[in-house]
């Protein structure tokens, strides 16, 4: 889907989340090759590079992202996904966190997916403070598709006379077709993961306005 070690100096696929960051290719740090992407002038901890997925990835398909990241000193670096739902609300999903001691931390084949009713889907990096951040060997790939095992009894059928078999899933977990197939085969009850939490169902602006 996309792969860059920034050896050609091109960082145009990435933008700053805060609008204040300076994003450049640098030969001062590199996980492999001679160059990496440098993100400096971060004013807040959530400032960092973001990568738009809308025109590169399809809804309902599972992907993996890999990268190497480091900061100037000890730090927790987070790889996350952001998307906007049909009502215009923005949501954030922490995919993985790694610790950098001033050395390179690696994110390897971290899975993600998103549903059809969302837009402005980004992968992004952030860390605990305003330290300069470096990213190298960034790659997004289509994840292997593993069909479910159909030649076994369905749990919901085995216990049909006793109780329901349920599971909890979030929107992004439910997006891949293989997950839908697995749930349809074995479960007859679903609990939404984060979608029923207060921040997902309450109108934040209206709540603040009413005091």
Per-region residue spans from a language model:
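Extracellular and organelle-lumenal recognition/adhesion modules and their flexible linkers in secreted
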Residues: 1-165, 173, 177-181, 185-186
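Aromatic-lined substrate-binding rim segments of carbohydrate-active enzymes
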Residues: 152-157, 197-211
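Structural recognition of the beta-strand scaffold that forms the well-ordered cores
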Residues: 164-169, 188-200
